[in-house]
C-alpha cells in the first residue's frame, strides 16, 4: 500500500451494531442509513454488512449514492431524499429506488419521471414535524398530500411512506421529541384517511431508535449507530452496546531529537519545554484531520498518548513524544479506534476539536484508504 495511513473498518462490528439496533427496534424494521459514504466508512461494504446482519432497507441522502449501490449489485429497498430540480429521477425509478417528496415541485418532477420511465414511483411524503428543514409543516402539508393521492389514483405514483426527522432526540431534557411524535402520528392519520397506500411510517434516527420507543413506528433509520458511534453526548458507545467500527492509523515518517525551546510547525504556536523526541504523522487537513485540533488531538504511539504539537498542516502533523520516548519511523500511530486497546476514540477527537463524532469520521478524505476487515468485502 503506497499511502502511509489507513482507516481500518471492521465489518463484523457493523454487523454487531445492526444486530443490537434490531434488538432495540423490536418489531420495527431497520433502515441502515449509509449516506456520506457510510459516514466515511465505505458505502458499499457497510451497506452489504448491514443487510447481512438483518437491515431490510438502506437510506442515502444523495441520488448518486443510491445509484452507486445499484451499480454494485445491491438491490435492497433503498430510499433517497436529497435532490434538486432537474435531477435524473427517471433513472432513479428505473433503478427501483424509493424517492422522498418534500415539496410540490418534487412531486411534479417525480410524476413526470414516472410518465417518462413508465415506472410507478414509490414515494415517501416528508412532513416537517418541527425540525424546520425539509418537508412542509403540517398546516401546509394537506395540499401536497391531496396532489400525491390524485397521482396515486392516476397510477403514476404509490404513496408507500410518510416520514419525518427528529431534531433533538439526543437531548433527554427536551420535550420536542414527544411533540414531533404527536405531529407525525397526526400526519400519518391524515395520509391514511386520504387513501395513501402506506407500507412504512418512519421517524426515528439513531437517538430515537435507542432512547424513544414511541418514535419507532414501522421502520427506524439509524445511521451513526450503525458504525458504532453514540448519538448522545452523555452515553458512550459501550454503554449502548455498540462497537465503533473505524480505526484510523498511520506510520510515523520521522522521529528525531529536538532541543528545549524548539518551535514546532507553522507559526511556532508550540515550543518544546525540554529536550524531547518529535514525530511526524503523515495525515493532515487534506485528509480530514481538523486543523483546529492542533494542540489538542490525541494520538497513541505504543502505550502512550500524545497531543498534536502545534498546527495541523495539509499533509502531516507533529507529536511531542517526550524525552524518554522509544519510537522509530514506521511505528504505528493510532488517532482513534474503539478504545478497546487503550487508544483514543472518535469521541475523544470530537471533544478535542469541539465538534461531534459524526464529523470526525465523515470528514476523512478520499485519499485515506479504507481497509475493510471481518466481512464479505474484507
From Swiss-Prot:
Which keywords describe this protein according to UniProt? Isomerase, Pyridoxal phosphate
> What's this protein's family per the entry?
Belongs to the alanine racemase family.
GO CC annotation, single? cytosol
Q: Give all N6-(pyridoxal phosphate)lysine modified positions.
A: 35
Q: Could you tell me which species this protein originates from?
A: Beutenbergia cavernae (strain ATCC BAA-8 / DSM 12333 / CCUG 43141 / JCM 11478 / NBRC 16432 / NCIMB 13614 / HKI 0122)
Pfam short name (any one) = Ala_racemase_C
For this protein, the record's SMART domains field holds: Ala_racemase_C (SM01005)
Q: Which reaction does it catalyse?
A: L-alanine = D-alanine
Asked if the Swiss-Prot or TrEMBL record annotates the protein with the keyword Glycoprotein, the reply is no
Q: Which GO terms describe its molecular function?
A: alanine racemase activity; pyridoxal phosphate binding
Q: What is this protein called?
A: Alanine racemase
Q: Which BP terms from GO are recorded?
A: D-alanine biosynthetic process; peptidoglycan biosynthetic process
Amino acid at each position: 500500500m503506497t499511502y502511509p495511513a489507513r482507516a481500518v473498518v471492521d465489518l463484523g462490528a457493523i454487523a454487531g451494531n445492526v444486530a443490537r439496533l434490531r434488538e432495540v427496534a423490536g418489531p420495527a424494521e431497520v433502515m441502515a442509513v449509509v449516506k456520506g459514504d457510510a459516514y466515511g466508512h465505505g458505502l458499499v461494504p457497510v451497506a452489504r454488512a448491514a443487510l447481512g446482519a438483518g437491515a431490510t432497507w438502506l437510506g442515502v441522502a444523495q441520488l448518486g449514492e443510491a445509484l452507486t449501490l445499484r451499480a454494485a449489485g445491491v438491490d435492497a429497498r433503498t430510499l433517497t431524499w436529497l435532490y434538486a430540480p432537474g435531477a435524473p429521477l427517471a433513472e432513479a425509478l428505473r433503478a427501483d429506488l424509493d424517492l422522498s417528496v418534500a415539496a410540490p415541485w418534487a412531486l411534479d418532477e417525480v410524476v413526470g419521471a414516472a410518465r417518462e420511465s413508465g415506472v410507478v414511483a414509490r414515494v415517501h411524503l416528508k412532513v416537517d414535524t418541527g425540525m424546520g428543514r425539509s418537508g412542509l409543516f403540517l398546516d401546509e402539508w394537506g395540499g401536497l398530500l391531496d396532489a400525491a393521492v390524485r397521482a396515486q389514483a392516476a397510477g403514476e405514483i404509490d404513496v408507500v411512506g410518510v416520514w419525518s426527522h427528529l431534531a433533538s432526540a439526543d437531548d433527554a431534557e427536551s420535550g420536542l421529541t414527544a411533540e414531533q411524535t404527536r405531529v407525525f402520528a397526526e400526519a400519518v392519520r391524515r395520509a391514511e384517511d386520504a387513501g395513501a397506500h402506506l407500507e412504512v411510517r418512519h421517524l426515528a434516527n439513531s437517538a430515537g431508535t435507542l432512547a424513544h420507543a414511541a418514535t419507532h413506528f414501522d421502520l427506524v433509520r439509524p445511521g451513526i449507530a450503525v458504525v458504532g458511534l453514540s448519538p448522545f453526548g452523555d452515553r458512550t458507545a459501550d454503554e449502548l452496546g455498540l462497537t465503533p467500527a473505524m480505526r484510523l492509523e498511520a506510520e510515523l515518517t520521522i522521529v528525531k531529537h529536538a532541543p528545549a525551546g524548539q518551535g514546532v510547525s507553522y507559526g511556532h504556536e508550540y515550543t518544546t519545554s525540554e529536550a524531547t523526541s518529535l514525530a511526524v504523522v503523515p495525515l493532515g487537513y487534506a485528509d480530514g484531520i481538523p486543523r483546529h485540533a492542533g494542540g489538542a488531538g490525541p494520538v497513541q504511539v505504543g502505550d502512550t498518548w500524545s497531543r498534536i504539537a502545534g498546527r495541523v498542516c495539509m499533509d502531516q502533523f507533529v507529536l511531542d513524544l517526550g524525552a524518554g520516548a522509544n519510537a522509530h519511523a514506521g511505528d504505528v500511530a493510532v488517532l482513534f479506534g474503539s478504545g478497546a486497546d487503550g487508544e483514543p476514540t472518535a469521541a475523544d477527537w470530537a471533544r478535542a476539536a469541539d465538534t461531534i463524532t459524526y464529523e470526525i469520521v465523515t470528514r476523512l478524505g478520499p485519499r485515506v484508504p479504507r481497509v475493510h476487515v471481518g466481512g464479505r468485502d474484507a
